[in-house]
Amino acid sequence: MAVRASFENNCEVGCFAKLTNAYCLVAIGGSENFYSVFEGELSDAIPVVHASIAGCRIIGRMCVGNRHGLLVPNNTTDQELQHIRNSLPDSVQIRRVEERLSALGNVTTCNDYVALVHPDLDRETEEILADVLKVEVFRQTVADQVLVGSYCVFSNQGGLVHPKTSIEDQDELSSLLQVPLVAGTVNRGSEVIAAGMVVNDWCAFCGLDTTSTELSVVESVFKLNEAKPSTIATSMRDSLIDSLT
């Protein structure tokens, strides 16, 4: 299901949280209410962890991850890294990355199988991304925007892209990602989709300003109405992909 939330009256929930199928990171902040919204929906299935990255609360923009791993920028402190390591499942690999484009969440986006990255991302970062997150990496733009991590959000079920993405681009991206895509907005018309929402295979959190129409589009494209945490479907898809590669 899709839920509305805000972080200290700020609707950009995608800046203050990072959600995957294996864990959820939530910014350290004055608003315990924000954390409890996530915990109420997710705590039965995955760990919900208070964290900061490089002293910042905008953790959703600073890191990139999926159920296999998490990449954080090089200026993440040892203490922060250790806290995240201790809080996440053992199966999740965590790695610091030396990258000029250090707001990794703005320049990369991924699900458990595929990643889109900024055209100028460092080659070494691309290799680390493929290795740690176990994804296939594509250098792309979304609606001519290089910040793919800001203007595109997708799970293993579907994706939402910048509203000005052409039909041709949507089709191309959809065939790369192997999920259906819809052009849309969150937070009453915001084009910066990834700043306004986070999603995994069974749950989405959008900013408080998100209209009911936007929310129903999110529930529809990410197939959230019939979704629940499922290891069976995940392992079936994994074995299918292994047999094809």
From Swiss-Prot:
Protein's recorded name: Eukaryotic translation initiation factor 6
Deletion phenotype: Embryonic lethality. Embryos die at preimplantation stage.
Tissue: Detected in bladder, duodenum, liver, esophagus, pancreas, adipose tissue, megakaryocytes and testis with lower levels in muscle (at protein level).
InterPro entries, per database record: eIF6
Self-association and partners: Monomer. Associates with the 60S ribosomal subunit. Interacts with RACK1. Interacts with DICER1, AGO2, TARBP2, MOV10 and RPL7A; they form a large RNA-induced silencing complex (RISC).
Residue positions where Phosphoserine is found in the record: 166, 174-175, 235, 239, 243
PTM remark: Phosphorylation at Ser-174 and Ser-175 by CSNK1D/CK1 promotes nuclear export. Ufmylated by UFL1.
CDD domains, alphabetized: IF6
Modified residues (Phosphotyrosine): 113
Keywords: Cytoplasm, Initiation factor, Nucleus, Phosphoprotein, Protein biosynthesis, Ribosome biogenesis, Ubl conjugation
Alphabetized GO MF terms: ribosomal large subunit binding; ribosome binding; translation initiation factor activity
Family that this chain belongs to: Belongs to the eIF-6 family.
Function, in words: Binds to the 60S ribosomal subunit and prevents its association with the 40S ribosomal subunit to form the 80S initiation complex in the cytoplasm. Behaves as a stimulatory translation initiation factor downstream insulin/growth factors. Is also involved in ribosome biogenesis. Associates with pre-60S subunits in the nucleus and is involved in its nuclear export. Cytoplasmic release of TIF6 from 60S subunits and nuclear relocalization is promoted by a RACK1 (RACK1)-dependent protein kinase C activity.
Compartments where located: Cytoplasm; Nucleus, Nucleolus
Superkingdom classification of source: Eukaryota
Keyword Phosphoprotein recorded: yes
Positions where Phosphothreonine occurs in the chain: 165
One GO term of the biological process aspect: ribosomal large subunit biogenesis
NCBIfam families: eIF-6 (TIGR00323)
